[in-house]
UniProtKB/Swiss-Prot annotation:
It catalyses: GTP + H2O = 7,8-dihydroneopterin 3'-triphosphate + formate + H(+). This is GTP cyclohydrolase 1. Zn(2+) binds at C71, H74, C142. PANTHER family: GTP CYCLOHYDROLASE 1, GTP CYCLOHYDROLASE I. GO terms for molecular function: GTP binding; GTP cyclohydrolase I activity; zinc ion binding. Its EC number is 3.5.4.16. Homomer.
Length: 180
């Protein structure tokens, strides 16, 4: 890692021995361990260990769960909120498990579209609800800091499964709950 940073500093014209940079390789290495810890965790295990049999057959919504991730194209952050709605069949998941699922997938090199899909697909596979919807809203620094440099752009993605995909009324109920 130290060789990588020495080469990086040299390529951008920095002095690797400058006081403020001496510990940078170690600090960044620790930061990267945290930012990409999702590779060391199994999202399916996180959900499997946090559900229980339930009797609820109405919509459950976890709204505005904040996340931070890294764009795999430019290695710049993107961040925002994810909302998950589901209609249980037999299993109800602990709310913190939804946040954990989001954290595991977001702590990897990502694109927003895949992040949204992975959350929905894993939730659908493990919890087997009658329907699940995931909506992700994010700001991408790769869009703000370079290229088109649009500071206020927000990208929205959604993935729908089961009743949310088949029934417009169910989808509309979820969207109304997000507004309230």
């Amino acid at each position: 890692m130290e060789n990588f940073f020495n080469q990086f500093f040299e390529n951008i014209g920095e002095d690797k021995n400058r006081e403020g940079l001496k510990e940078t390789p170690k600090r960044v290495q620790e930061l990267w361990k945290f930012l990409y810890k999702g590779y060391k965790e199994d999202p399916k295990v996180a959900l499997k260990s946090a559900y229980f049999q339930g009797v609820c057959d109405e919509m459950i919504v976890a709204q505005n769960i904040e996340f931070y991730s890294t764009c795999e194209h430019h290695l710049l952050p993107f961040f925002g909120n994810i909302s998950v709605g589901y209609i249980p069949k037999e299993k109800i998941v602990g709310i913190s498990a939804i946040a954990k699922l989001i954290e595991i997938y977001s702590k990897r090199l990502q694109i927003q579209e895949r992040l949204t899909t992975q959350i929905a697909e894993t939730f659908d596979e493990i919890i087997e609800p009658r329907g699940v919807i995931v909506v992700c809203e994010a700001k991408h620094l790769c869009m703000s800091m370079q290229g088109v440099q649009k500071q206020n752009a927000i990208i929205k993605t959604s993935v729908l499964r089961g009743l949310f995909k088949k029934d417009p009324k169910t989808r509309a109920e979820f969207m109304q709950l997000l507004k309230s």
